[in-house]
Amino acid sequence: MAKYNEKELADTSKFLSFVLRHKPEAIGIVLDREGWADIDKLILCAQKAGKRLTRALLDTVVATSDKKRFSHSSDGRCIRAVQGHSTSQVAISFAEKTPPQFLYHGTASRFLDEIKKQGLIAGERHYVHLSADEATARKVGARHGSPVILTVKAQEMAKRGIPFWQAENGVWLTSTVAVEFLEW
């Protein structure tokens, strides 16, 4: 595996997140319903758009991402973002799964007033993202400011018929979390 510096890996990861989660049309690629993009076409379109992207760099980002944001298809010809999509091109069919008793959501303190009014909503994404542990939720919340960890009564939600899914990178997903299922 070729050597890349941390900035190059982080910049490429952000670029891939933008294109594979939110705006594939920004470089002229089309994702299938499961979010897959042909790697050769992705690299070519990225280069035409002025982004330095090679197969080796892409593979390094996939292999070294601590959050496992991306995955290769079984034949190695395609790549996708595992979760976090806002583009209408993608509707990944996750298998429904029974959650643990509690899940966690990391946010910034400045969002608490709104969350107390409406609960957790997906916003522009397809799902609300939840963590299985407080440490991961804290890291997520810290990206947005002073972190606050909310506890989600996940099993109680599931018992009331609210579905949960788990992405292959371990992130838990649900459509919304009503205020009654949150602990501050």
Curated annotation (Swiss-Prot):
One GO term of the biological process aspect: tRNA splicing, via endonucleolytic cleavage and ligation
Signal peptide (from-to): none
Protein name, entry field: Probable RNA 2'-phosphotransferase
Enzyme class of the recorded protein, top EC level: transferase
This protein's UniProt keywords: NAD, Transferase
UniProt key word Glycosyltransferase: no
Superkingdom field: Bacteria
Family from the record: Belongs to the KptA/TPT1 family.
Pfam families: PTS_2-RNA (PF01885)
Database matches in HAMAP family: KptA
GO molecular function terms noted in the UniProt entry: NAD+ poly-ADP-ribosyltransferase activity; tRNA 2'-phosphotransferase activity
Role summary: Removes the 2'-phosphate from RNA via an intermediate in which the phosphate is ADP-ribosylated by NAD followed by a presumed transesterification to release the RNA and generate ADP-ribose 1''-2''-cyclic phosphate (APPR>P). May function as an ADP-ribosylase.
E.C. numbers: 2.7.1.-
Bilayer-crossing regions: none
UniProt-listed InterPro entries: Ptrans_KptA/Tpt1 (IPR002745), RNA_2'-PTrans_C (IPR042081), RNA_2'-PTrans_KptA (IPR022928), RNA_2'-PTrans_N (IPR042080)
